[in-house]
Amino acid sequence: MAADVHKKKGWEVPNGSLAPGDGQHAERSESPTPGLAQGTEPGAGQEGAMFVHTRSYEDLTSPEDGGAVVRSPEERRGEPAEPTSMEQISKDFSELSTQLTGMALDLEEEMRQSQEGKLEPSPQATRHDSVLSGKEEEDVTMDTWRMHRKHVFVLSEAGKPVYSRYGSEEALSSTMGVMMALVSFLEAEKNAIRSIHADGYKVVFVRRSPLVLVAVARTRQSEQEIAHELLYIYYQILSLLTWTQLNHIFQQKQNYDLRRLLAGSERITDNLLDLMAHDPSFLMGAVRCLPLAASVRDAVSTSLQQAKAKSLVFSILLSGNQLVSLVRKKDQFLHPIDLHLLFNLISSSSSFREGEAWTPICLPKFNSSGFFHAHISYLEQEMDLCLLLVSTDREDFFTVSDCKRRFQERLRRRGVHHALQEALRTPFYSVAQVGIPDLRHFIYKSKSSGLFTSPEIEAPYVREEEKERLLGLYQYLHSRAHNSSCPLKNIYFTGPRENLLAWVTSAFELYICYSPLGTKAGAISAVNKLMKWIRKEEDRLFILTPQTY
C-alpha cells in the first residue's frame, strides 16, 4: 500500500525529499540572504511542518501509487484499515456515486454484469446526458473546438475513452484509439513516448496503468508542467475510485467503460483544470493561507484541536482555496496535492452549503488504497468558511458532527467571530502594502512549510486574459528554474509590458513581476525589501505554529 505517511524522525520519503526536520527549531535568520537554511526562511514553521515535503514535479513523478511501502505499525497508526476485500470499498463508492449522480452504483454488481455481457448502455456514461455536467457538448469537427489552447484526454489502456476536456468522448473515441495505438507501438519497440513537439503544439503523454493521460497544448508551459497537470487529473480520478478499485476493475475486464463509474464527476475534473489555469497553488505545489492575525489564527487552531474525536485524522478550515487552519493527528502528514483535491471537491459543488455532508474520499498521496470519510459543512451561510473533518470511521458521522458543534462553541467563547468576518471581507492583500512602487505582483514559497503567499492580482492585469498571461509568464520562469537537464537559480526576464525575476534557493522560491521601466539593479533592491516585508508579516501570511491532536 502506497502512502506518504511518515514518522517525524529518521525517515525519507520514497522520492528522496526530506522529512520535516527537527532543524526547524533552529534560530531564524533576520537577514533575507541566499544563505538562509531550509527551515529558517520567512514563512517556515517554527514548531514542525504540516505537510509532507514536496519537490513539485519531481514529487508527482515518484514511484507509482499502489507499490508496497514497508512501515511499522506505529507509522500506520491513523490510516484507514487495509481493506480485506472489495466489499467495503464498493460500499463506500456507492455512497460517493449517490452524492455525485443521485444514483447508487454497486461496483461488484457492475463487474458481474460486465463479465456476463449484460450491461446496457448507461445514460450516465456520456457527458451530454449528465445533468451535473452543466455545459453543452462541442462539435469536434468545428474550428472552435480546435482553437482551445489546451485539450486533455484520459483513456484506458484498451483505448476506451474515459474523459475529454472539450467535446464528447464518443466523438473522440477514434482519436483516443490512435493515441493508444501510438503508445502501444512504441512500447512494442521497448520504448516509451513522453511528448511530441510540432507546429507550436506540445502533445504530452503520461501513463499510469491502467490509464493513459494525454494533453495537447499550445501554451508557455513546459512538458514537465503539462505532465504535472495530467498527474493531478490522475490523482483526481483516484480520489473518487481508489487505486485498489481502479486496478480491480481492469483486472476483471480490460475494456471496461470507466465512464459508468465516473458519471457525474466530470464537473469536478473540469473544475480542477479551471483551477490549474488560474491558481498558482498547483504550479507551486504549495498551499496559500488566508491572511489573518496570528492571535486569531492561534485561537481558531486551538479550538479545532480541542474539538477532536478518536477517529479524526485531519481538521481543516478553509475559505475559498485558502487555508485558515489545519490540525493533524500526531505523526500524520497531509500532502499538498491531497489538500488541493479537497479544495477542488468543495469548490466544484454548491450543495455543501446546504447542510452537513458525509462523503467517502480517497486521499491518494496519503493512502491510495481506501476511503476516508469527510464531514463537510459551512460554519454559517453568510460566512465563506468551510470545515472539513476527515475521519477513519465510516460510522462516526454523529460524533464528528458534534466536533463541529464544539468547535463553533469554542470560537464564540473566544470571541474571534468578528475578526474572522473582517478577514473574509479582504481575503487578499494589495501589493501596495509592500511599499515598492514598481512592484506589480509576486509569488513567494517557503519550501520547508509547503506554504506560499501572493497578493491580489491588480491593474494592469484586470481582464481574465491578462491574468492568464501573467500566470503563463510565471509558468515559463518556473519551467526554466526547474528544468530537469539545466535548472536555473536566477532568471531575469525583460518584456515589452513587464519585467520579471525568479530566484530559487534550497529554502524558498520567489517570482516577482514589476514595471517594464524598472532596472535589474532596481529589481534586486526590490527583492531585498520584499523579503524583509515578508519576514515582518510572516505570522499573518503563514501558519507558523501548526497544531496536532
From Swiss-Prot:
Region (Disordered) residue spans: 1-90, 109-137
Composition-biased stretches (Basic and acidic residues): 110-119
A single GO BP: protein targeting to vacuole
Pfam families: Fuz_longin_1 (PF19036), Fuz_longin_2 (PF19037), Fuz_longin_3 (PF19038)
GO cellular component terms listed in the entry, alphabetical order: Mon1-Ccz1 complex
Annotated GO MF terms: guanyl-nucleotide exchange factor activity
InterPro entries: FUZ/MON1/HPS1_longin_1 (IPR043972), FUZ/MON1/HPS1_longin_2 (IPR043971), FUZ/MON1/HPS1_longin_3 (IPR043970), Mon1 (IPR004353)
Family as reported in the entry's similarity comment: Belongs to the MON1/SAND family.
PANTHER family with a match to the protein in the record: SAND PROTEIN-RELATED, VACUOLAR FUSION PROTEIN MON1 HOMOLOG A
Function: Plays an important role in membrane trafficking through the secretory apparatus. Not involved in endocytic trafficking to lysosomes.
Record protein name field: Vacuolar fusion protein MON1 homolog A
Source organism per UniProt: Gallus gallus
This protein's encoding gene: MON1A
